[in-house]
């Protein structure tokens, strides 16, 4: 395997654990990245400890101001204008995945992954978000707006 490093969006939850196991079984060296969106020190500590228990490097990046501006303010504004906001979709396409890609680039890591349940299919030279194999856990709706350059970096979909 030529480039076997991957940066994993890592909350420390069960899906993050599953992603680590799947990636390692496929021969990848995993580095975990936890994004600090709300200043939840208990969540950050849990992620750090769990990454340590798995024996993988752990990094954290604060995106609090960006999250407040791009997700919380958007949600509030949309709600008060009588619109139906989609904060999770917006967070994934504007914060989580772009930050994961930028951090991977800064570290010289070519691949990114998360524990989200979805698949990527290719057609006509492009990659598309499609439903997960398990419809009960499918999260493709929250990821529909991921740009092509992010999909091109993405390795794994549970």
What are these regions (language model features)?
Residues 156-158:
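Conserved small/polar residues in nucleotide/adenosyl-binding loops
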